[in-house]
Amino acid sequence: MAEPKYKRVLIKLSGEALAGEKGVGIDLPTVQAIAKEIAEVADSGIQIALVIGGGNLWRGEPAAEAGMDRVQADYTGMLGTTMNALVMADSLKQLGVDTRVQTAIDMKSVAEPYIRGRALRHFEKGRIVIFAAGIGSPYFSTDTTAALRAAEIESDAILMAKNGVDGVYNDDPRKNADAVKFDKLTHVEVIKRGLKIMDATASTLSMDNDIDLVVFNMNEPGNIKRVIFGEQIGTTVSNKAELRK
């Protein structure tokens, strides 16, 4: 087997990725299909962390705009990410993959608290760790959670698994047939161009900690493994890449 490009990765999934064609809620067959892809990679000896959004269940910003207290709205969203994490963990465990959920808010009846040293020991023992409940504070996105946790666990890369989007473009390819896809970008270019891969806080964290981002289409079976083993798919963002287009 070829040598992997990345040996420890953090996979960032949107909450909507778990909803399937419904777009909202949790579609269990969809979760199970994603879990199967992740399990195949774990079987290759890759150390894997996951961060899953909560947008399939709740969005804090629209709730705040509708009149809800923003802090309470964001805490509600953190609970949504925990629900998604528990469902994904169960699907992975049913495939024989030892998995732990760690939450930034204490929920000891259902998950471990986030402790960096414990997470690192889980990786050493071949376990997948799912980080839930954001960073435990309002106003921070799950993109920022992914960037922060990736830095803390010294992940080689963040894999931004997208629904039906095969990389980063200079315009929306669904609206502009002439939109150009980038193969490689620098973190600085992403920030300067205002490309919405992650929010600005998450992008800056990734740049400052020299963490690669790979944006790719998760709906294509085998793509997670292809990215990890160095196949050029999607868009890679790093401090070293040169702008190609």
Curated annotation (Swiss-Prot):
GO CC field: cytoplasm
InterPro entries on file: AceGlu_kinase-like_sf, Asp/Glu/Uridylate_kinase, Uridylate_kinase, Uridylate_kinase_bac
Residues that bind ATP: K12, L13, S14, G15, G55, R59, N163, Y169, D172
EC number: 2.7.4.22
Record: residues binding UMP: G54, D74, I135, G136, S137, P138, Y139, F140, S141, T142
Superkingdom classification of source: Bacteria
Complex formation: Homohexamer.
Record keywords, A-Z: Allosteric enzyme, ATP-binding, Cytoplasm, Kinase, Nucleotide-binding, Pyrimidine biosynthesis, Transferase
Region Involved in allosteric activation by GTP, annotated ranges: 20-25
Family stated for the protein in its record: Belongs to the UMP kinase family.
Pathway: Pyrimidine metabolism; CTP biosynthesis via de novo pathway; UDP from UMP (UMPK route): step 1/1
Name of the molecule in the record: Uridylate kinase
Catalytic activity: UMP + ATP = UDP + ADP
Keyword Plastid attached: no
Function: Catalyzes the reversible phosphorylation of UMP to UDP.
Gene Ontology MF terms: ATP binding; UMP kinase activity
